[in-house]
Amino acid sequence: MTMNTKSNFLRIFAQPLSDFPSISGVDNDTAHLNKKKILMFDMNALLANAAGVTQSDSRPTKTLDSFPLLPQKSKKRLDVSSQLHLDIGFDTEYVYNPQTKQNDILSYQSYVVLPDGTGVPGILYPASAHKKDRLSLKNFLAKTLTPLLKNEQINEWPGSITLYAHFLRADVASFSDFWSDHKILLKGIRSTVSSFKNRYGIDFDEVENRREKNSLITFDKRTSPPRCSNVTFIDTLLITPGGMGLSECGELLGLPKLTIPAPYSISDMRHYLKGDRRGFEAYALRDAEIAVRYALQVKSFCAESLMITRVPATIGGIGVSRFLKTINESGISSEICMGTRTVTKQCWNPETQGFRTVKTRQSIPARELYETFPINCYHGGRNECYMMGITPEREWYDYDLAGAYTTGLLDILQPDYDNIFHSRNPEDYCGHVMGFALVSFQFPDSVRFPCLPVRTEQFGLFFPLAGESWATAPEIALALSLGAEITIQQGIIVPWHLYESGDVTNSREQECSVFLPFVQQVRENRNRHAKGSLEEKFWKEIGNSLYGKLAQGLHAKTAFDTTRGLNSPLPPSSVTQPFFAAHVTGFVRAVVGELMNALPPNAIVVSVTTDGFLTDVSLENIDMSGPLSSRFQALCDIADPGSSMLTCKHQVRQLVAMKTRGQLTYKESEGFPIVHARAGVKPPADIPRDDYNRYMVDLYINRAPGHKLRRGSLISTRDMWLNESDLVAVESEIRLNLEFDFKRQLITPTMNEGHLLMHSRPWDDMSKALKQRQLFDDWRQTHALKDEADWDDWCDFLYCRNVYTPLKLKVGQNRSDDVLVRLFLRALAQHQWGLTPDDKKRQTSTEVAAWLVAAGYSVTASDVKNAGRAKLPPIIFGSLTSRMNRLMDLIKPVYPGFALPSAVL
């Protein structure tokens, strides 16, 4: 650029914008723009203008035709290399590095299953344990598969690959490129992850041609000729019945998980690798082998028994597909049954640059209009503890309803959504009816176990004697039979199609039972296989999983969305059905409630948990003749002919009752399984599983206020994804909470086995229940309810908050007698509550203070002198606490005229 040009170029910044007509879109109104903004325009025009060169615009003028209605489709996606499919189990071994707070990767294991079933193990070691030397997913697959080509074990590059690991999120983060390329392609499911978009284009040629030290390769890059595969991740944990561990999977396969010999341990695999490389490799490779062999066994099972050619992501998904298939096979329209309709719409697909047809299911108007009722009536199971402490010694039985929810599904016939009607007549909710209502209720005081649930956001379900409840028809019918006064505020009845009688065993009703074909298929297939086999367990899990899918998404439960990095509401499943979910849970709660209320008057119930209860009544003495129990037994006869509706799962001689879901065995009953529910407490890792019960009993008996436990847990999916962390253990301290949860009102304190023992009664109403629960949460911060002195202190604390606090009397850490001392001094100074001027003269302020100090109260002469300044509150005393009675026993001999207003002495 010449000096002339430079000066011309600089000169333009001093000129007004109107001097540059060649700059389109600039007028005098924009003259105030910052000079730097000139650079946003065509700089070539500016430079040409500055140099005195005329520049012509050769670009064609664009018209509307230049912008087509539909953009052109993008280039055709790269095809996969071949039709060959390979299944690969993989695993990693690592040790935690406290300096980096990440894992040092020791090895990557693979176990490739060829099309003929031959297994090829392989193990790869990174150059070092440093994070920079980790293998990428592409490198791992390339180094695993290339030797197979060279050895002619495969003759072409696989077009599709499925990677299997047990608890997938423990291993996928070990790849160097996982967080940059793949983390949004995995979906969070039940604390782990699985593929939900399964195509990754991998240029394996490029990977093989690069050195190990330079493995930073764009995942979607293509070369020519390409080696491109579809890769899918499957977590085998999600396809195990009950979330079995890898060792249990190995046992089912006859392929046991190897053990680590002493002196080595799982906590220091580096030591094992250095000391016994061959043993380390055998142990590591077996885990990868079990994962893929188990998955292929499941795949074979799905193909032969379920007609599904792929390995499902979860067992719950199988349950859904089988249910819909059985409905269609039985001649019932799944849409009519579920109250849905198929809606077709056109959606733009940016990948193909074209429209695609999408079909979705939506509720029909009749269902959508009324489904708020069942959603509000969906509460889950009944969970309560009726005792606190160590029970008397006798036989205690833990009963469960046989297949509670699966059996309960049989109670559902085909609903007639178009004829739903409102009803405020309680009698309409009796019998075999699907109904949902908001009710007001009052049970007689004699009812031990009220059956209408009241939901709280913080503390779960309560069952008080009076209140308001969103209840199902079976619960309303039971409440009426117990003598409750019921007022239906708003309610609906959902009629059955082809309903003819109240007898569920009626053949016409069985034909209409929505879930009968599904339940029969599950039962028949379970019976076809040996008990405890993989197939039998799989069918059992398929049957049990369906209920959860019916209720999925009804309440505001959230799950971490790995694609967005946010906690998102758990979406409904394809069979979410509030009418079915609410009816089944209400029916099961009602059956359990009927059984407990039918027990002999002197029977003791320790607790109830969802579908069963702990009691001292033997099976032959339980009355199962009630209408709801009879109906449930009839359903059991359909599901499993000849079976009993109640099964005894545990039997012990003595129990420790702590709180809801917290019952332990104090003394065993020989030959029977023990009761062991830990209320969410996880024993330390060094405690053997066989010693868990004894550990928990000792922990409960020796607990102290503020007791804290160290808890080791794995980092959550949320924290792992947001922080791009390895799967590492997280240590935390939690406050022990084994105190009673006050879902019931404690009564009759006694001591047994050195610990406080109490029974309970239902709350009169929810206001008392919630207030006392909140106050107890305050009290237990510095106290534990272990003996009669603790009970006395709690009752005193409760009295202070209920009587003194509303009168704005300062309580703080004081107790009822401390406050009464202050009130006594005010009455003495002001000649109130039966005290006279002569009483005031009887002792000096110093003498009164000394007298009370000797009795254990913190009082000074100034307190006595100043007592006349504060007014006495307009208090009316009811019954007194033990502390107040002791104080009155101290005062009355000295001041016999002293009397509390309306006190009961």
Give a label for each model feature.
Residues A173, T236, G242-G243, N383-A556:
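Catalytic nucleotidyl-transfer cores of nucleotide-processing enzymes
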Residues I239, G245-W348, V592, D611:
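Acidic, Mg2+-coordinating catalytic module of metal-dependent nucleases/exonucleases
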Residues R286-A288, D398-G403, G543, P601-V617:
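Catalytic palm active-site di-aspartate
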Residues K299-M388, E485-A598, A603-I604, T615-L905:
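C-terminal, non-catalytic extensions of nucleic-acid polymerases
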